[in-house]
């Protein structure tokens, strides 16, 4: 009886009941190759779905029916594409897709009007959809370690963006529209091919406290001659005033959180 009771407690039906009760499905490191059918049966009750570190290659179209989901984590899988139906997840706040094989994102991504964090580092993206500019509530965008050669001009529409990470790509130009990101606090573009930044970036992005551009062709002289550099440097020093002394902050080889001395 005890054995049968144990099996019953972990039956698909009982799991669905439990997941509906909590709103949370956590299946990390479960050796899954597909998204279990029971997950989709949770329906409108599902708020958090974590499928980190499995071997899932495909996200089913039915994921679009999970309309109350707020957090979707699929990091460390084998996903190659995102279904257009993801655009139905209007309550989604956090989407984590790091360490997959994704080469393109659907334009429907821009329909995620409540999205606050999008992390899709270590994939194979060659471009971002134009609709990324429709994500006006997004606070964090991480597209590091992809194959991007540019950021879309539409990124200037991400009016709430506070942190942009795009390290380890092949980006050559930063669009002038980035100057519209008045909430931007941190911009990290290490390991790209950037030779210059929009002239008004430091002047217009008055919240900016941290720029990291190591391993790029841009020179320290170019950076220091940008409009608004003095004010930016004052903000940066104020941020670290109580944490790091000036000898560490300004080393002999680089401006920490800045640009290599070429």
Curated annotation (Swiss-Prot):
Q: Where are the LRR repeats?
A: 19-42, 43-66, 68-89, 90-112, 113-135, 137-158, 159-181, 182-204, 206-231
- The UniProt transmembrane annotation reads none
Role played: Leucine-rich repeat protein that likely mediates protein interactions, possibly in the context of signal transduction.
- Inactivation phenotype: No visible phenotype.
List the InterPro entries: Leu-rich_rpt, Leu-rich_rpt_typical-subtyp, LRR_dom_sf, LRR_domain-containing, LRR_R13L4/SHOC2-like
Summed up, the tissue specificity of this protein is: Widely expressed and preferentially in leaf sheathes.
Matches recorded under PANTHER family: PTHR48051, RAS SUPPRESSOR PROTEIN 1
Signal sequence bounds: none
Q: Which organism is it from?
A: Oryza sativa subsp. japonica
Alphabetical list of Pfam families matching this protein: LRR_1, LRR_14
Q: Which domain of life is it from?
A: Eukaryota
What's an example GO BP annotation here? Answer: intracellular signal transduction
Q: What name is this protein filed under?
A: Plant intracellular Ras-group-related LRR protein 7
Keyword annotations = Leucine-rich repeat, Repeat
Similarity-based family? Belongs to the SHOC2 family.
């Amino acid at each position: 009886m005890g054995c049968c009771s144990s099996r019953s407690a972990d039956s698909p039906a009982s799991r669905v009941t439990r997941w509906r009760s909590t709103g949370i499905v956590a299946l990390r490191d479960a050796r899954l190759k597909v998204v279990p059918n029971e997950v989709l049966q949770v329906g409108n009750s599902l708020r958090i779905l974590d499928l980190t570190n499995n071997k899932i290659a495909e996200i089913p179209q039915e994921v679009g029916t999970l309309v109350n989901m707020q957090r979707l984590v699929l990091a460390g899988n084998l996903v190659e594409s995102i279904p257009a139906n993801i655009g139905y997840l209007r309550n989604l706040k956090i989407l984590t897709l790091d360490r997959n094989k994704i080469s393109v994102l659907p334009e429907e991504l821009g329909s995620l009007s409540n999205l606050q964090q999008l992390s899709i580092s270590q994939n194979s993206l060659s471009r971002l959809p134009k609709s990324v500019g429709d994500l006006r509530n997004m606070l964090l965008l991480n597209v590091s370690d992809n194959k991007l050669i540019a950021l879309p001009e539409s990124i200037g529409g991400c009016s709430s963006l506070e942190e942009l990470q795009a390290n380890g790509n092949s980006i050559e130009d930063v669009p002038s529209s980035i100057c519209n990101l008045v909430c931007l606090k941190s911009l990290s573009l290490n390991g790209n091919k950037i030779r210059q930044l929009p002239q008004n970036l430091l002047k217009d992005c008055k919240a900016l406290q941290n720029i990291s551009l190591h391993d790029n062709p841009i020179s320290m002289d170019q950076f220091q001659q940008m409009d608004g550099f003095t004010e930016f440097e004052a903000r940066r020093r104020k941020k670290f005033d109580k944490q790091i002394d000036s000898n560490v902050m300004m080393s002999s080889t680089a401006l920490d959180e800045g640009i290599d001395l070429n």
